[in-house]
Amino acid sequence: MSGLRPALSTFLFLLLITGGVYPLLTTALGQWWFPWQANGSLIREGDTVRGSALIGQNFTGNGYFHGRPSATAEMPYNPQASGGSNLAVSNPELDKLIAARVAALRAANPDASASIPVELVTASASGLDNNITPQAAAWQIPRIAKARNLSVEQLTQLIAKYSQQPLVKYIGQPVVNIVELNLALDKLDE
């Protein structure tokens, strides 16, 4: 019985620290230092939540920039279905899937002459990616300019405005948040 008391007191102490103090402290610090990020990086227009800067949305119309394909096919960009869902490079199903995506992109973007950027035909690891490169966004400009009756220059400037540089200059590449870019595109129509 004498050996049980130290084990029980250690258990209760660690339970208090890891189950109470640590979660409350990290939540409080997150809310204090990073309130926007700690609350989901929600994009708001007035009182309406339009999306999250962290999760892509299924923009399918010709007047919108399209993001990376969602790996959660039945319900695109569903965070509850997220996970390692990409097929292996050696899987013949991946070739068929990419060929179908290429054909769909070519059909939707007949005026685009350059080769299709790889991120427009491959899903990210989570299947929820909200970012593409500025080059992938620029590849879609002819379709969007035609659908929205906007100039190529207007769309190029919009992409440049919403492009984010990597935190460290030589590590990573610039990206464009598709949700923010498409919401800005809708504001041009107002």
Swiss-Prot record:
Top-level taxon of the source organism: Bacteria
A GO MF term: P-type potassium transmembrane transporter activity
This protein's record includes keyword Repeat: no
Localization: Cell inner membrane
Bilayer-crossing regions: 10-30
Membrane disposition: Single-pass membrane protein
GO cellular component term, pick one: plasma membrane
InterPro entries to which the protein is assigned, alphabetical: KdpC
Pfam families named among the record's database cross-references: KdpC (PF02669)
Main subcellular location: membrane
Reported function: Part of the high-affinity ATP-driven potassium transport (or Kdp) system, which catalyzes the hydrolysis of ATP coupled with the electrogenic transport of potassium into the cytoplasm. This subunit acts as a catalytic chaperone that increases the ATP-binding affinity of the ATP-hydrolyzing subunit KdpB by the formation of a transient KdpB/KdpC/ATP ternary complex.
Protein family (similarity comment): Belongs to the KdpC family.
Subunit note: The system is composed of three essential subunits: KdpA, KdpB and KdpC.
Protein name according to UniProt: Potassium-transporting ATPase KdpC subunit
